[in-house]
């Protein structure tokens, strides 16, 4: 077992911060189209004693909302990202496949100017329709299967 972290950058300062706190593995957000940056970031992390294992990738709404033909173009891009990550030596890609996404209300502010992501039920408009419309369980699973059928063969 090891200590990992996500959501921090890959600057030398940030990597040294991780090492000082016993973190040996990380994932972060790096442009998945840029193979050279992926490889360089992984090498720089390793030089500081941290293994860059994964990166976060966005899943475009065209995929989660099944908007053809853009969905297939975006899936082609994700397949390219998988290939880049593999060539760069990354273990995987981190993503969130969600039709609705995170439901939030406006941010709240705390001490020292800190910002909190929040959800306050009394401020949430549950009657406002989502762009995805009403989607049943079978349709969601069909969209997930469509995604996985395209990306798993590339990842293997």
Short names for language-model regions:
Residues 64-156:
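Active-site acidic/histidine proton-transfer and metal-coordination neighborhood
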Residues 7-20, 37-41, 73-83, 144-150:
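Short, acidic/polar
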Residues 5-13, 28-40, 63, 72, ...:
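Acidic-and-aromatic substrate-binding clefts and catalytic sites of carbohydrate-active enzymes
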Residues 1, 50-65, 124-131:
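N-terminal small/glycine-rich loop or linker at the start of catalytic domains
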Residues 28-32, 50-53, 77-81, 118-120:
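Glycine-rich loops and low-complexity Gly/Arg-rich segments
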């Amino acid at each position: 077992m090891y200590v990992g972290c996500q959501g921090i950058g890959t600057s030398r300062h940030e990597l040294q911060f991780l090492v000082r706190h016993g973190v040996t593995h990380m994932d972060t957000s790096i442009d998945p189209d840029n193979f050279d940056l992926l490889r360089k970031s992984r090498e720089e992390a390793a030089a500081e004693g941290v293994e860059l294992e994964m990166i976060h990738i966005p899943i475009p709404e065209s995929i989660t909302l099944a908007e053809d033909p853009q969905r297939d173009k975006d899936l082609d891009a994700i397949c390219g990202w998988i290939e880049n990550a593999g060539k760069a030596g990354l273990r995987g890609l981190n993503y969130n496949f969600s039709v609705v996404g995170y439901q939030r209300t406006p941010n709240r502010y705390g001490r020292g100017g800190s910002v909190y992501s929040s959800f306050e039920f009394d401020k949430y408009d549950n009657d406002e329709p989502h762009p995805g419309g009403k989607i049943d369980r079978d349709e969601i699973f069909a969209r997930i299967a469509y995604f996985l059928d395209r990306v798993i063969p590339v990842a293997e």
